[in-house]
């Protein structure tokens, strides 16, 4: 017992030591588990430092040279990275025209190494895109330069051909002598103060080889060439007249295009000069192309043949000064195109164009809204023809010694019953709507002008129609000359005058019936606005069952129009149109 410990005590010590070892191992495991998360985080921290540039290599006493080389390498890498980044940003944007265009002055020479480095810095795809854009720009520039050169060559050829044709026409006119002048040779056209050139002489035989399109193209080419010539500046007094002339030119040329497009014969038939009924171009009558050229040049007086009447020329001169004392001005021209015809319902029709200008004076009183003889509301061509007829009647009755050229284009009195109306058809043949245009007046800034001197307005009439060969207008030869006669003007006024609605005859009223004595109360006639009295004789219209005084409705149906004054239905059956009773 004394030599050693007992067996139970040894077992207890062994168990205690084993328990201590196990507890220590558990503590170590717990500490390892706690430090594992920190270790992983700490292991990641150097990589984060390298990304942020916070960690640097450890320096040693013997590594001074190595550190300088490393810094130099890092600086080179950073500069290369920056250059590549900037190049990518520049290549992302589309190149501008200025960047693609060659430099105006040679750039400063650069070293080969620097150029190669910048070229290598641009990606291959971006370099190809840049080269493609530059090639496209160069091709577009070449096409633009070639088109400009072609336009210049075309303009030069047109000018040379115009000069050659003018030279040939001068030779023909000089060799023809007096005979060519009798057949309507064209003289030099002069604007106020300077010449605008010579229109190519085109007789009836020379126009036999050209159609309507060539004829119109020749006229427009001549007008375009005349624009390039130097013209004298228009004085302020003539500005309104020149503007009016060019406005008439635009309206007339537009209706020529309408006439050409509406005719189906211009593709196969030839075009002749607008001439008189005899086929010869008389002295004083100008061709339509010369008429347009004179209007475009501002020669309204010469284009409308107003210079043949000194009184009308004086009125136009006064109208330019916008004087109230000058009388009304009426200018009138008619043209026909014999070969530009077409078939209409089995009948050949010939186109004609009527151009008219009428001056209108504005009233300065408070009654401007009231219609007057010179009111701008007179917008129908018959107003112009009526004034011309009245003017001619007065001129011919003054003296028997009056010349044939002094009996038109002058009107001192205008009837008060002239009213506006729409354009009507000529003899039932297809007629396009005429053009009626007003030019706004222009006032002068002059303090010396009194209140009664007001500006003028101008009404422009352009009428285009297709008439048959046996139409009375074509059988009036003076209408296509500079001296239309009084009878022909009356004929034209009756043809294009205001169309009245159809009226009933006395026989139609007798057959209509519907007469009865009135037996009601508290009603009145809507024609005379009088109350009906007992046993008043009334007439009831069968179409609408409206009734009126017999005398009132009979006068309305026979003088005004054959329709009900209340509902506008047909009044009584006429001899040509049978009635259809209302169900």
From Swiss-Prot:
Biased composition (Polar residues): 1-38, 156-165, 172-191, 384-408, 420-452
Major place of residence: membrane
Keywords: Membrane, Metal-binding, Phosphoprotein, Zinc, Zinc-finger
Disordered: annotated span: 1-39, 53-124, 156-197, 362-452
GO BP field: ubiquitin-dependent protein catabolic process
InterPro entries the UniProt entry points to: Znf_RING, Znf_RING/FYVE/PHD
Subcellular location: Membrane
Zinc fingers (RING-type) by residue: 525-568
Recorded GO MF terms: ubiquitin protein ligase activity; zinc ion binding
UniProt keyword Zinc-finger present: yes
Chain intervals with Basic and acidic residues compositional bias: 70-80
One cellular component (GO) term of this entry: endoplasmic reticulum membrane
Record field: compositional bias (Low complexity): 88-102
Xref: Pfam families: zf-RING_2
Phosphoserine: residues carrying this PTM: 580
Protein name per its UniProtKB record: Uncharacterized RING finger protein P4H10.07
Annotated organism of origin: Schizosaccharomyces pombe (strain 972 / ATCC 24843) (Fission yeast)
């Amino acid at each position: 017992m004394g030599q050693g410990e007992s067996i139970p005590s040894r077992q207890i010590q062994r168990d205690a030591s084993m328990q201590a070892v196990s507890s220590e191992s558990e503590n170590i495991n717990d500490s390892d588990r706690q430090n594992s998360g920190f270790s992983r985080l700490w292991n990641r921290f150097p990589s984060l430092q390298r990304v942020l540039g916070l960690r640097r290599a450890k320096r040693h006493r013997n590594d001074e040279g190595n550190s300088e080389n490393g810094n130099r390498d890092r600086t080179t890498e950073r500069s290369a990275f920056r250059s590549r980044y900037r190049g990518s940003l520049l290549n992302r944007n589309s190149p501008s025209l200025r960047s693609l265009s060659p430099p105006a002055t040679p750039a400063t020479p650069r070293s080969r190494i620097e150029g190669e480095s910048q070229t290598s810095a641009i990606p291959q795809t971006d370099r190809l895109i840049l080269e493609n854009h530059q090639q496209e720009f160069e091709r577009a520039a070449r096409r633009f330069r070639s088109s400009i050169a072609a336009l210049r060559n075309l303009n030069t050829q047109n000018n040379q051909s115009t000069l050659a044709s003018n030279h040939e026409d001068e030779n023909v006119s000089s060799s023809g002598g007096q005979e060519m002048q009798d057949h309507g040779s064209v003289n030099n056209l002069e604007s106020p103060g300077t010449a605008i050139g010579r229109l190519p002489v085109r007789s009836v035989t020379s126009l036999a080889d050209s159609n309507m399109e060539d004829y119109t193209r020749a006229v427009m080419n001549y007008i375009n060439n005349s624009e390039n010539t130097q013209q004298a500046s228009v004085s302020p007094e003539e500005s309104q007249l020149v503007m009016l002339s060019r406005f008439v030119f635009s309206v007339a040329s537009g209706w020529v295009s309408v006439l050409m497009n509406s005719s189906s014969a211009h593709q196969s038939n030839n075009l002749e000069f607008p001439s008189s009924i005899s086929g010869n171009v008389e002295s004083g009558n100008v061709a339509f192309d010369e008429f347009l050229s004179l209007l475009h040049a501002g020669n309204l007086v010469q284009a409308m043949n107003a210079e043949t009447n000194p009184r009308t020329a004086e009125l136009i001169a006064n109208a330019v000064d916008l004087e109230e004392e000058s009388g009304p001005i009426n200018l009138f021209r008619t043209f026909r195109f014999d070969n530009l015809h077409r078939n209409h319902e089995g009948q050949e029709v010939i186109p004609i164009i009527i151009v008219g200008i009428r001056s209108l004076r504005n009233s300065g009183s408070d009654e401007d809204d009231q219609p007057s003889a010179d009111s701008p509301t007179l917008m129908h061509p018959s107003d112009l023809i009526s004034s011309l007829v009245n003017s001619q009647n007065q001129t011919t009755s003054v003296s028997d010694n009056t010349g044939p050229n002094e009996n038109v284009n002058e009107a001192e009195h205008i009837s008060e019953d002239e009213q506006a109306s729409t354009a009507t058809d000529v003899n039932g043949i297809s007629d396009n709507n005429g053009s009626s245009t007003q030019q706004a007046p222009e006032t002068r800034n002059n303090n010396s002008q009194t209140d009664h001197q007001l500006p003028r307005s101008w009404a422009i009439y352009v009428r285009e129609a297709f008439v048959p060969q046996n139409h009375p207008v074509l059988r009036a030869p003076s209408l296509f000359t500079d001296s239309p006669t009084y009878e022909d003007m009356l004929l034209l006024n009756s043809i294009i005058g205001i169309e009245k609605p159809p009226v009933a005859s006395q026989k139609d009223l007798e057959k209509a019936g519907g007469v009865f004595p009135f037996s009601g109360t508290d009603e009145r006639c809507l024609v005379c606005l009088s109350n009906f009295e007992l046993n008043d004789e009334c007439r009831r219209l069968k179409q609408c069952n409206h009734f009126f005084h017999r005398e009132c409705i009979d006068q309305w149906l026979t003088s005004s129009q054959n329709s009900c004054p209340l509902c506008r239905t047909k009044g009584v059956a006429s001899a040509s149109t049978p009635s259809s009773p209302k169900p």
